[in-house]
């Protein structure tokens, strides 16, 4: 099995995701969105889809750099802003983040990264409240399955059009959407500290893990069959452990059931049935 097996009909994917954005916004009673523009491929793809679905006047991009953020990230975010002609604001997070960092040791990179991600989430939701825009997420399927993201940080949003696309599929969609090539070919990075890269953090490439996840989820192959495809056992075991261990990140908070009608369990009226007022 090869990574090419993950290829999709990206014309169809585009149509489905544009309809998703348009219809979900209507159901929620919104007409515009706000999203973080990091300069990476995921936010670029979501921004492009939002403009095609809603019109550029209904899309606001926030650039939220920290002092150590790379200039390349800002340049690539601005490249998308100019390409699409959307509204954009730059809101540096350095003053807020540094107030937290004063009590977090420099070698605690995970804690510091989480603080940065959650600070950006606060800004996105504040702009949502200010302007009446729906916060749109940019986490891809690979990140969500592996738990490679910050709970109530970059994983927080009201809707997410690319959450069922593996990273390699996001790249394929990006080429279909004519996203600028520099954003597609650069090494993926959350840009949480200088020199940080996703694949260095994870210890494997997106191509390798996407193929493994595809076999585990979409093909529903067991361990024996997957190892028969040339996947090394330690790699399989590590990825499976990450998927299982991070299930809590893919769920709403679990509620202890005490009554006959519990929110999120058996009190679940579909919002589609309700008239938006």
UniProtKB/Swiss-Prot annotation:
GO terms for biological process: NAD biosynthetic process. Deamido-NAD(+) binds at residue 118. It holds the Pfam family NAD_synthase. Signal peptide: none annotated. NCBIfam families: nadE (TIGR00552), PRK13980.1 (NF010587). Catalyzes the ATP-dependent amidation of deamido-NAD to form NAD. Uses ammonia as a nitrogen source. Belongs to the NAD synthetase family. This is NH(3)-dependent NAD(+) synthetase. The gene is nadE.
């Amino acid at each position: 099995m090869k990574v090419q097996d993950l290829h999709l009909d990206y014309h169809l994917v585009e149509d489905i995701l544009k309809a998703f954005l348009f219809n979900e916004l209507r159901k929620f009673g919104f007409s515009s969105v706000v999203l973080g523009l990091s300069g990476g491929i995921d936010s670029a793809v979501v921004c492009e889809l939002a403009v095609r679905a809603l019109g550029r006047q209904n899309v606001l991009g926030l650039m939220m750099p920290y002092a150590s953020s790379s200039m390349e990230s800002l340049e690539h975010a601005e490249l998308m802003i100019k390409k699409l002609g959307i509204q954009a604001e730059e809101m540096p997070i350095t003053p807020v983040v540094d107030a937290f960092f004063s009590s977090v040791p420099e070698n605690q990179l995970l804690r510091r990264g989480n603080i940065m991600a959650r600070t950006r989430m606060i800004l996105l939701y504040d702009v949502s409240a200010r302007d009446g825009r729906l916060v749109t997420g940019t986490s891809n399927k690979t990140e969500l399955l592996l738990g490679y993201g910050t709970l109530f940080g970059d994983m927080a949003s009201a809707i997410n059009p690319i959450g069922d696309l593996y990273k390699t599929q996001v790249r394929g969609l990006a080429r279909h959407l004519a996203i600028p090539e520099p954003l597609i070919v650069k090494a993926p990075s959350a840009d949480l500290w200088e020199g940080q890269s996703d694949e260095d953090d994870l210890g494997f490439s997106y191509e390798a893990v996407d193929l493994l996840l595809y076999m585990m989820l979409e093909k529903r192959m067991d361990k024996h069959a997957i190892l028969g495809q040339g996947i090394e056992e330690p790699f399989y075991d590590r990825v499976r452990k990450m998927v299982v261990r991070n299930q809590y990140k893919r769920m709403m908070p679990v509620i202890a059931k005490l009554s006959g009608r519990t929110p999120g369990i058996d009190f679940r009226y579909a919002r589609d049935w309700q008239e938006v007022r």
